[in-house]
Amino acid sequence: MRVTFYTLGCKVNQNETGALAQLFEENGYTVVSNEEGADVYIVNSCTVTNFGDQKSRKWLRRAKRENPGAVTVLTGCYPQAFPDEAAEIAEADVVTGSGNRHAILTDVQKVLNGEEERVIDIRPHEKGERFEELPMDKFAEHTRAFVKVEDGCNRRCAYCVIPRARGPVRSRNEASVLEELRRLADAGYKEVVLTAISLPSYGTDSGTSLVELIEKAAEVPGIERIRLGSLDPDMLHDDDIRRMAAVKKLCPQFHLSLQSGCDKTLRAMRRPYTTAQYADIAAKLRAAFGADNVSFTTDVIVGFPGETEDDFEASMAFVTGMRFLKVHVFPYSRREGTAAYDFADQLPEHEKEARSRRMTAAVEEVRAAEAAAMQGRKASVLLETPLSATMFTGYTKQYLPVLVSAPGHKTGDIVEVTLGAWDGKRCRAELV
């Protein structure tokens, strides 16, 4: 039997898809690409935006057109957040949520065997539930491994449907994380990325902390780089920063969630910090890791309800002033079940899209300038994608994309380079 996966959304979703693929392989299935015909099609959905829901439905329709006899599965955040709507999608033979992923295999078998015509298996998240272990040892990139350490979010930001889609904070057992890291190191992975729905919340439900996990992860032989997923700035304290800076394996690249550079908009979004507090945390990280050594990335929403032109200009000024290496810009998506859904002064779609284009153009200029400022510096690069026998793309510790000729090296090697010119997509570099 052949199974294929279509994944939308964040690194956590990608990690979970990989774990599901491994589960199906271990039970006799062959995992194939989206372009190949399959007996089972699994859509791992994202519901952060309306567009994500639309793409999930579109892919299910495509799967049924390609193979009307196949079993189609809709799983993940979309069904969990909107179970009634998801259950009505006729093209989905199996509908499951963001929990109890192990049951997908059994649900699929029920339909394949004719025991059930359709399976709707969406289970509500409950307070006190435990982290669901989904072991994973193989990654498509073969060089960087994503390790999920936490699920759920206890915050209630006005725009965000994720707490509804993912449930409360649930931390993975520390011993389980470290055991997976040891397996990955034995398999040759040199860089790991700790991913989560609310990464700084790790350990808040189990008496430990993210910093403790980072320190112990750094002790795993063979792991040379540790990278962090998204961080909420207000959850980073002075002692956390001091301890993280002492971990030499920790990549000095921080994805600090911002969402807006306007204080009025941040208050409306129910984000628990001001732009001044955000800038202060970034300044402390720069001081601890070295101003020329650290980089920042972030997410920004434009067109939030009530955002005036002046608010947008203030946000853009703050964002460009922070000198982010990369910014993900999103036009606000109105999500049912969130506080902002009922806010007055909803902006028209064309205005949100226009602001998205303006913000994107501004942050791309900053990205190019930041990359150009690194020209001539020495950096270590993890070789990832071979373009030829000797040419590779890869990333520095600061997550700067690099193109380098490295004869005699292979994917997965870490090499020392001198950074060169920025070509609009990546830095050209030469081996030291």
Where do the language-model regions lie?
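Terminal RNA-binding accessory module
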Residues: 342-432
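Conserved glycine-rich "GG(E/T)P / GGGxP" loop and the immediately following alpha-helix
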Residues: 47-52, 189-216, 220, 232-239, ...
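Short, surface-exposed connector motifs at secondary-structure boundaries
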Residues: 2, 67-68, 220-227
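Proteins enriched for Cys/Gly/acidic motifs involved in redox and nucleic-acid/cofactor modification
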Residues: 1-202, 239, 244, 250, ...
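Radical SAM/AdoMet-radical enzyme domain recognition
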Residues: 186, 211-212, 219-220, 225, ...
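Hydrophobic, well-ordered secondary-structure elements that form the walls
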Residues: 256, 299, 319, 327, ...
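Contiguous mid-protein beta-loop-alpha structural module that forms a pocket-lining wall or clamp
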Residues: 307, 322-324
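Conserved strand-turn element in the central/C-terminal portion of the radical SAM core barrel
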Residues: 160-167, 225-234, 260-270, 291-311, ...
